[in-house]
Amino acid sequence: MKKLILKSLLLFTTLLLTSVACKNLEEGEKFANDNLAKGGDISWLPQMEASGYIFYNDKGEPEDCFKILKDHGINSVRLRTWVNPSTHPQSGHCSRDETVEMAKRAKSWGMKVMINFHYSDSWADPGKQNKPKDWEGLNFEELKQALYDYTYDVMDALNKEGISPEWVQLGNEIPSGMIHPEGHTDNWAQLVQLLNKGYDAVKSVSPSSKIILHVDQGNNNERFRWWFDNAEKHGAKYDIIGMSFYPWWLEGKPDYKEVIDDLGNNLSDMANRYNKDVMVVEVGGEDSKPQNTYYMLRAVIEKVKAVPNSKGLGIFYWEPQGARSWSNYALSAWGRDGRPTKALDAFID
């Protein structure tokens, strides 16, 4: 009888522990999902507001864009910063002071912040990586110092407002490098020296900020292996691999379903090959096809969540609020009626 009682107690204890373990696992999975960065690059927002653009919530009521985004699951923002920008509404602004004000506003809404250094006076992307005008004529040592000083200055301005960005991206879509010609991938040694100067400047002010290096065409594993193999070979310092995913910009404009598995495979390969966290730091779909964009975003979120060892950190929609009527941009998540489209629901469903 004593043996039977002991066996029964042992079985009960085992079942109890298993139940607790399963509950903890479920809670852990929920916590991990809650921690996923669901973000938007909303750098156009101040200029949109200054021009008189009115944002409406799902009920058709005027409302602060931050509130609308937060109600749709957005918990993080990405802010680009330019060295000496013009006042052009779409291709200017994003100065240091404007970036700091936007970061303060995001923090007041309880959001995390990513700072995106373009190291240019305007757009930097795969098609152009123009050196800031004030940096022209500098020799390479002077150029490295200018990059360090500028990066430090922006980070210090944020720090003085009590802001330590969760993430800082050095360069924007840099498959060919940045700050051409010195930082072109034709000269990896110089490019990495520039990147590492940025890394050092960020960490000297905000050691907790994670550094992102960003390449476009997140579905193109060959492109990423080539780029990060070279970055590693030359000693680049970074924490996170960032990628863009825009099926609309790919050759032939394929539907997302044709390339989504390639994105997922690349995310996992980057995490495993380099032992780094990964993020989709830019994504977008056609505003004229909000349901399809919704499905695409849900698929991207699932691919990020599926990266082994919880190394998939998040996804950022590029200018979700950047309505075409104001920006002439075809890949926002905002409709002609001034309201978010169905696409934005992907972050709460």
Where are these regions (language model features)?
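Bacterial N-terminal signal peptides that target proteins for export
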Residues: 1-9
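N-terminal substrate-binding region of glycoside hydrolase catalytic domains
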Residues: 30-112, 118-147, 153
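Active-site beta-loop-alpha junctions enriched in small/polar residues
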Residues: 42-45, 82-84, 118-122, 170-175, ...
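Aromatic-rich peripheral "rim/lid" segments of glycoside hydrolase catalytic domains that contact
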Residues: 50-53, 269-275, 287-349
